[in-house]
């Protein structure tokens, strides 16, 4: 299928890259929606293996941010976990010649219509149960939502999960929210700690057994695409929200 050419979205305001676990970095940036005109935060996770860097849930960085990223190592791979993310993946592929990995069944469409005809990027790898991932200690936990989503499970630091839209940890709004998002998103159920993503749950309709199956994973830390990192006892902190899914 021919790709629809489009310019890379610009770098939007973001914070500093910070190491939340040895070899695992986290940076909070911005996403901007047109209708309704909401602006709120999103996170990128940077996982280091030797001198290689794997970016998960990409957020485009500004010039200073890219210099800080380059100081950490060489970007070789980009991993997309949530179908609602990925708009900055083409930028990192072009800049670093990075290999792009997505969950099988996802497509790069503009906006939130996963079934739209036009796509703006084709991945290098569509990840399934038997896919050898770009991190030697990683595996994928796939959720059969529509479109599908996955968790990246790292066998390090007593188990570390990187999440897309399914698990969120917005205990409060932050500096990247505009006034409308500060008003609307609490009412919509987003601003809660240790939360199952409410819009994702409603729109993507994951099987409850797949969501509850997350509790069968062994992890102490959770790095979400939205909200603060949870370092220590993460599975138990998310247990109540996951068990409420029906």
Regions found by a protein language model. Name each.
Residues 1-64, 115-185, 209-216:
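Catalytic core of the metallo-beta-lactamase
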Residues 47, 67-69, 189-191:
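A short alpha-helix capping/helix-coil boundary motif
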Residues 56-59, 79-83, 103-104, 143, ...:
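Short His-Asn-centered micro-motif
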Residues 26-29, 71, 193:
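Generic signal for short, ordered secondary-structure residues
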Residues 15, 21-22, 34, 59-60, ...:
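Cap/insert and terminal regions of metallo-dependent hydrolase folds
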Residues 87-88, 109-112, 147-149, 169-172, ...:
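Short, well-ordered, mixed-charge alpha-helical segments that flank or form enzyme active sites
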Residues 50-53, 70-76, 219:
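Short, surface-exposed connector motifs at secondary-structure boundaries
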Residues 66-132:
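Active-site HxH/HxHxD metal-binding segment of metal-dependent hydrolases
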């Amino acid at each position: 299928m021919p790709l629809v050419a489009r310019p890379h979205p610009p770098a939007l305001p973001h914070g500093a890259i910070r190491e939340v676990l040895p070899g695992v970095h986290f940076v909070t940036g911005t996403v901007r929606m047109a209708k309704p005109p909401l602006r709120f935060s999103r996170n990128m996770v940077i996982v280091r293996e030797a001198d290689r860097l794997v970016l998960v849930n990409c957020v485009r960085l500004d010039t200073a941010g890219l210099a800080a990223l380059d100081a950490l190592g060489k970007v070789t791979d980009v991993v997309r976990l949530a179908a609602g993310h990925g708009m900055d993946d083409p930028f990192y592929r072009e800049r670093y010649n990075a290999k792009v990995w997505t969950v099988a069944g996802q497509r790069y469409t503009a906006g939130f219509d996963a079934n739209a005809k036009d796509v703006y990027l084709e991945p290098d790898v569509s990840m399934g149960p038997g896919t050898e991932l770009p991190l030697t200690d990683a595996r994928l936990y796939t959720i059969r939502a529509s479109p599908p989503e996955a968790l990246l499970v790292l066998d390090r630091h007593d188990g570390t999960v990187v999440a897309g839209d399914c698990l969120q940890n917005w205990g409060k709004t932050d500096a990247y929210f505009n006034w409308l998002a500060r008003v609307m998103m609490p009412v919509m159920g987003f601003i809660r700690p240790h939360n199952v993503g409410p819009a994702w749950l409603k729109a993507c309709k994951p099987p409850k057994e797949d969501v509850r199956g997350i509790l069968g994973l062994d992890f102490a830390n959770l790095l979400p695409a939205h909200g603060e990192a949870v370092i220590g006892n993460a599975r138990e902190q998310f247990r109540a929200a996951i068990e409420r899914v029906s």
